[in-house]
Amino acid sequence: MNKYQNAAHLSGRFVSEFGMEAYPHLETTKRMIQPVEQQHPGSAMMDFRNKAGDHERRLSTYVAENLPLRSFDLATFTHLAQTVQSETMRYAYKAWRRMWGETGRRKCGGALVWQLNDCWPTISWAVVDYYLVKKPAFYAIARALRSLDVGIARSDPDWTNGHNDPTLADPADFEVWISSSRLESVEARLAVSFISIATGRHVRDPIIRTVEARPNATTECVDGQRAAEIDKDDLGWGKDDPYVIHAVLEVNGKTEATDTAWPQPLKYLDFSSRGVSVEYSSCKTEVRVSAKLPVKGFVFSETQGLELSDNGFDIMPGEVHVVHIGGSGVAKAGLSWTYVGAERTEVAASRPKL
């Protein structure tokens, strides 16, 4: 098995099939798995609903290698599996779209994800389940395929070779680029920030540039830079202060795209006390999500008929992520949500706070 972080090295002129398995949302699982006693990872009925060969070994390996597995209950494992699938889509689509390059230097011309949706209620590679409920990976693909997108590639240590020291600092070599499918050049403002996961502070000065995104091409913006090592003597057991690299692309003062590169693996990071806030508008047609500290993989648990404008996203301090809500499945008592490292699945208050 290959790490999904290595997607950029697994490309071709056309990627005809690739994917990653994930559980559907909880509502779908509970509809297809009966009796209730079978609703847990590894049960006979759960295995029956997964037709992939060696699925136990493959899915569990990807989760255990990358994410903090503090509980094996259905809700927690569902979120972690969905996060793995979503991260795979982010790494793959952004890397391969970058390889579209420019005229005369095209390296990758397209990719087909396996698969779009299911033909029966199951656990599979689909990014939309049998009841047309979208998994977080669907939104990761949508974000990566925006007409104007920004991407970050960050160096990753090999933490599975048995001879690594997880307390050492990540040197964080990184690159930033813009992918455009528009037919005209676009002048944009690019801001790259370096944010401490532990404190939310900016650990070095941001990179701010005005760039011209070329039409139907990739525009390389930051190439081969290395972020400085940040001392962490007063913050805990490690020898550095882990931080995210966060890029924001604006056109005429409006945010067109963002991307965030985290230190790998995510399971070594402390996600406690994120200070997440979820607030409904007065008419409950939108919800605003914010956090005091960087958050990974914020996911609303979706149900049949519910329509969200976005899901499965990261949150940075100082930003407000607005999600529009619609459809026949709008939850009247509040949407259930969680994120990587959350102590428990939390429920947003239904009373408006705006």
Question: Which stretches of residues belong to each language-model region?
Answer:
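Substrate-binding clefts and catalytic carboxylate motifs of secreted carbohydrate-active enzymes
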Residues: 1-186
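Conserved active-site loop/cleft motifs that coordinate metal ions or position small ligands
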Residues: 109-115, 299, 335-339
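Short hydrophobic alpha-helix segments
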Residues: 123-124, 128, 206-209, 259
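Long, low-complexity ectodomains and other extracytoplasmic segments of secretory-pathway proteins
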Residues: 144-152, 160, 255-283
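Beta-strand-rich binding/interaction modules
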Residues: 169-212, 220-221, 243-249, 290, ...
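Terminal connector regions
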Residues: 177-178, 220-274, 324-354
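Intrinsically disordered, low-complexity Pro/Gly/Ser/Thr-rich segments with frequent PxxP/GP/PP motifs
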Residues: 190-240, 305-331
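C-terminal accessory/binding modules appended to enzymatic or scaffolding proteins
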Residues: 272-326, 340-342
